[in-house]
Design a protein with these regions (language model features):
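Membrane-interfacial helix-loop-helix modules of multi-pass inner-membrane proteins that assemble, modify
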Residues: 33-70, 171, 207-210
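Hydrophobic transmembrane alpha-helices and their immediate junctions
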Residues: 225-261
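Alpha-helical transmembrane segments of multi-pass inner-membrane proteins
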Residues: 26-46, 67-124
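A membrane-periplasm/extracellular boundary helix in multi-pass inner-membrane enzymes
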Residues: 128-167
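Long extracytoplasmic/lumenal interhelical loops at the membrane interface
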Residues: 165-226
Length: 302
């Protein structure tokens, strides 16, 4: 886990001042080939399509370990492609977003990622037609990781089966709070991570796993795997970089980062470059010019 943090941090540093478009294009090509390739191979049986049963609903993983892994890849790819094409094909991309969301609900039952794709679709539509209009709420977006990390960490730590409100939330998010509370009870939280911490997931098995204790929430999980100081440092970096993008007028990017921060209250990929490439764009050079973007929108509208 510490090695992962070191490698990911090095990538964050190595991408400083790199052209954001170049990074996104490379991500779309590499991740796109991987996801589409594995998906197709799972359809023809060359890669196992693990199917999970949740309350009578069959959830397909399409070649990945778990359905939410596949759904998360789709979410981040949709964000990357849509951001690259943010001034083009708005209704084609919007239709694709709706269809992709419906597909994920029907075949993966990954509700959060399906909802996140729909929210992303709405966000891209809004910014396409808003022509760079600034809303007061945008000033709060750079602090989204602080808010969402604090909420899910607090609720997980305070979770109790005797609290009906927290039990209701736990049920809504399929047991995430209970798993987080179990981690707090089982492992200590330290400044630089908990030694020998081990989260047991499905491990490629579709039946129930004895001792399952996998914590999905990125923020809660990283408290144990990376430690308090690295998590706080990452959040500070996020806030500083997001504030800079906000001051530069890159409101769409800040909104995307906020949506991802919300998604990672439940999902485990906030600081994983194979999924969330946007976290690693924080210090790249944003070559998506605000002025150019507004000019293109104005031309399209006429």
């Amino acid at each position: 886990n510490r090695l992962n943090f070191l490698v990911y941090s090095m990538l964050l540093v190595l991408l400083v001042n790199v052209d954001m478009k170049v990074v996104l294009r490379n991500y779309v090509v590499v991740a796109g080939i991987l996801v589409v390739g594995v998906f197709l191979l799972s359809l023809v049986g060359m890669v196992p399509n693990l199917q999970y049963n949740r309350a009578g609903v069959i959830r397909n993983s399409f070649g990945f370990i778990y359905p939410t892994d596949f759904a998360s890849h789709c979410f981040y790819l949709f964000l990357a492609i849509s951001y690259l094409l943010k001034d083009k094909f708005i209704w084609t991309r919007s239709l694709f977003g709706v269809l992709l969301s419906a597909f994920i609900i029907k075949y993966c039952d990954a509700r959060l990622n399906a909802m996140s794709i729909l929210l992303a679709t709405v966000i891209f539509i809004y910014f396409y037609y808003s022509n760079g209009k600034k809303l007061k709420i945008f000033a709060l977006l750079p602090y989204s990781a602080v808010v969402f990390a604090s909420i899910v960490t607090y609720l997980s730590y305070k979770f109790s089966w005797s609290n009906p409100f927290l039990v209701s939330i736990n049920k809504l998010i399929t047991g995430r709070l209970a798993l987080g509370r179990n981690a707090f009870d089982t492992f200590g939280v330290h400044l630089f991570g908990t030694r020998n911490v081990q989260f047991i997931g499905s491990g490629g098995k579709t039946e129930s796993v004895i001792g399952y204790n996998y914590v999905d929430s990125s923020y809660v999980q990283m408290l144990f795997t990376y430690g308090i100081l690295p998590v706080v440092l990452l959040i500070i970096i996020y806030v500083v970089a997001s504030r800079k993008q906000y001051k530069d007028g890159q409101y769409l990017l800040v909104a995307i980062l906020s949506l991802i921060a919300f998604n990672c209250m439940i999902e485990a990929f906030w600081f994983v470059p194979t999924y969330n490439i946007f976290m690693f764009l924080l210090f790249t050079t944003n070559t998506f010019s605000k002025k150019e973007s507004n000019d293109i929108v104005a031309i399209n509208e006429t």
